[in-house]
Amino acid sequence: MQTSFHKFFLSMILAYSCCSLSGGGYAAEIMIPQGIYDGETLTVSFPYTVIGDPSGTTVFSAGELTLKNLDNSIAALPLSCFGNLLGSFTVLGRGHSLTFENIRTSTNGAALSDSANSGLFTIEGFKELSFSNCNSLLAVLPAATTNNGSQTPTTTSTPSNGTIYSKTDLLLLNNEKFSFYSNLVSGDGGAIDAKSLTVQGISKLCVFQENTAQADGGACQVVTSFSAMANEAPIAFIANVAGVRGGGIAAVQDGQQGVSSSTSTEDPVVSFSRNTAVEFDGNVARVGGGIYSYGNVAFLNNGKTLFLNNVASPVYIAAEQPTNGQASNTSDNYGDGGAIFCKNGAQAAGSNNSGSVSFDGEGVVFFSSNVAAGKGGAIYAKKLSVANCGPVQFLGNIANDGGAIYLGESGELSLSADYGDIIFDGNLKRTAKENAADVNGVTVSSQAISMGSGGKITTLRAKAGHQILFNDPIEMANGNNQPAQSSEPLKINDGEGYTGDIVFANGNSTLYQNVTIEQGRIVLREKAKLSVNSLSQTGGSLYMEAGSTLDFVTPQPPQQPPAANQLITLSNLHLSLSSLLANNAVTNPPTNPPAQDSHPAIIGSTTAGSVTISGPIFFEDLDDTAYDRYDWLGSNQKIDVLKLQLGTQPSANAPSDLTLGNEMPKYGYQGSWKLAWDPNTANNGPYTLKATWTKTGYNPGPERVASLVPNSLWGSILDIRSAHSAIQASVDGRSYCRGLWVSGVSNFFYHDRDALGQGYRYISGGYSLGANSYFGSSMFGLAFTEVFGRSKDYVVCRSNHHACIGSVYLSTKQALCGSYLFGDAFIRASYGFGNQHMKTSYTFAEESDVRWDNNCLVGEIGVGLPIVITPSKLYLNELRPFVQAEFSYADHESFTEEGDQARAFRSGHLMNLSVPVGVKFDRCSSTHPNKYSFMGAYICDAYRTISGTQTTLLSHQETWTTDAFHLARHGVIVRGSMYASLTSNIEVYGHGRYEYRDTSRGYGLSAGSKVRF
């Protein structure tokens, strides 16, 4: 194999010689061999290759090639495995694989290098490119010093950069798999060091893992731009380490020993666009744990963008480690940017975008558990923009300042929740405050965003159905370099369709800005505080929970008098009723004095600004529980709902009277509220708005009604009706003296929902068996039916039941009482006993279940007039008009649930008299022992009484009556049967029925067999 390898290099040299002599200006094309070349088994030195052609060189693969265990780190002239000195350099894979493993050298680019000053370096079309355990060590070069006129030979150490090194633009295009594992360089770019890097069209694997650079760019360093676009494979940077900047990626102007061929005056940038996924996990550097960039960092239309467990630590590598001649002020930001550090570099003329991190059109953005010893646990930048993204979350990031995000002086923040929520939660900063939480001996407090002096928020908005949730506060630095108070205000939810929520849920958020609510809501959760320069409303609403505060920012310096335009003007104020009741320790019956101090919402300051509230205020019960709490509103109450601190406003200008704007709820306790101000005029004291509640009654909500209990009586009646249908099917058919029959039965019934949302669906199935015997023209029979079923009310209740039914029936073909009008008659009676097992799945409490028994009695009588028809007419044998009467009675016993939401149910009953009138058609086959029967009838319920079920909610001692639904009085029913005699003694049959009434439908199917004797 070694022989063929040398032949390859000989042919390559000859090819270059020919190209040089021809002078035709054509790019050289060279084929590289296939095989495995292992330095541990080679008998001669590996022929390292350096090429160069001003017209460019294209190298293409002849097959799978692996180079491993090669070391020329101590050679007099250390080289890359493949190097280019002149012109563009293109490496074509042609669907093959190229692997570099355990390569060691002391020059730039242990595997591949391009030192040309112009052109492109392109690597394209490989099935797999793999670089693992490649080392570029310090190069020890000779130097000379003069000492008293004599020269003393000395050496100097120079760092080496990149497993792949390129002084020109590097393109990685359309490769299936691309991976760098555990590579190490003494300088920059543990995997790649290039002027610029473009990664595009990677289809299966693209990973940079556990690469290390002693200086910048644990995985990659560029001096103009890094771009990853249109990659189907996730782009992953995992556990890479940089001694100084950018554990994953470093985009710096002073890279490549400060001798880059780049002439650009703009800052280098980093961008990811249209990738399936981008992941930075566990990368470490002194500054910019995941990404360090002099210029902008942009994420555009990626499926997922994840930054996890990245760390910016100032002490990871000793300070004396070589830093490639970087500027000394790098240390100013040591520890900043746990995941991303975006430096506010030297801006190009006319540019104002430097230092910007942006997310636009992202599917998911997730920053979690990133750590910065300095500022910006997740992101350090001057500007941050999030727009047109799905869910965006910053969770559990930690920093000395700016738990999730730090924006420098005069920074700008733009957040727009367009297609998902933006959430900040569990982010921490170091603090010296007393009683702060302690984490591993360090006192911390929550913080989402920290902004340097002069910072401002330009956009804060959420589309309908979405929110921006600050479980951690925003803090703007105090300072004199704040935006002018006359500048454009921050417009909350500005733009069409932005009616979502901006939620401040915890801590003290400070905005040195004038704020205007355009639409949607600002929400202040319990004990959260928002301080602004001023706040007004042109639309939307302000929602406050108990203990929350809307205040003015403190003037800077503190001795400065308050600004004249520090105003809070509200026209649509909403207060959380449930939090007010909970935090005022409301009890039933009320205690005097109250069990604890009140905690109303607070607006205004005693030292600054003035407050105006106009229009009605609203009590909000978002989870619909406040009006259903016995301990809160089960009796008359008086609570503090709002404390208004008038600040510099004279006490004589009392607030105007307020009224309640919202209507009383339909469910729960019913009553009325009255609002009144309670002034404390001493020392310009606050006004307290007190609300007095007067109870008038109780109306249970849909979850408490339990309509399934009385409606189960209809289910018991339907069970017996299905048994009677099975009996009717067994009686019809060919005549016989005696017989046994068995039939499967099923029943399906649906009733539309009512105004309470209560519907009824009933499904049951079982079997019937019976015996018939004829006595002359009369037939007598007995039957037993067992049914299993389930039902639900379409709210929170569902029930399973089991019923047993006994039936007796008699039919005759003789006229009744000598009448000549009707030629046959029947009578049926059935009794059913059933057990119900109901479960109630509350949305606000644990599930409850209860059992009870139902009893049901149904009697039926009917008469008809058979009319025999000539077989040739209508293909019928018999036409039979009929009239029937059905009386039904059902009741349930009294019973009581267990648990906190227990209800007691009194017994109830239902009676119904139904009169069907219709006609039946029969046809018997003349050639086959078959029979067909069809019936259609009009139904009128002539009499009905429903007692309802008296229900008591034990915890509230409130009682109401729940009625069963009222079936429409009129309806139609159709039935059809088919019979087939298998032998002279065995007959099988099928039966179906359908009943329609306004708001309800029911149908049943059965199949059975008769044995005749």
Curated annotation (Swiss-Prot):
It holds the Pfam family ChlamPMP_M. GO terms for cellular component: cell outer membrane; extracellular region. It is a peripheral membrane protein. PROSITE patterns: AUTOTRANSPORTER. It comes from the Bacteria. It is found in: Secreted, Cell wall; Cell outer membrane. This is Probable outer membrane protein PmpG. The gene is pmpG.
